[in-house]
Amino acid sequence: MYFYNVYGKRQICRGDMATVVGIFEDCILNKKSLPVVRPGSQTRRFTHVKDTVNACITAWIKNKNAHYSVASDKSYSIIQLARMFSSKIKYLPARLGERFLSALTLTNLNNKIIRLKANIKLKDYISDFLSKNQTI
């Protein structure tokens, strides 16, 4: 199974393996600007950990011997994601070799055997996070 930008409770928020959602959450909690690598139009598909686990369970139950791409069907740019947090943004220089589009294409999505819809929406997750942490 291939997982794409999994986010949720207990995600990695610092270091080389940190998720972008986790990095942004950590910045909010520490009252720092959100770091966005220029140009910010890079797109990613973000999938909540509970939706990822549901996909794994479904694959196990179906007992299919295949490769699965587990990702939301909606892409967001990094700048769109940052704006969902309603915080200051700090632009970082572009990185050599930065991927601009989600690695998951429509072809990958159409070839999935497991067809599940994301139950947890990224915007709802972020709104919930902000409402729980606005006094911090």
Where are these regions (language model features)?
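Conserved short acidic donor-positioning loop in nucleotide-sugar-dependent glycosyltransferases
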Residues: 73
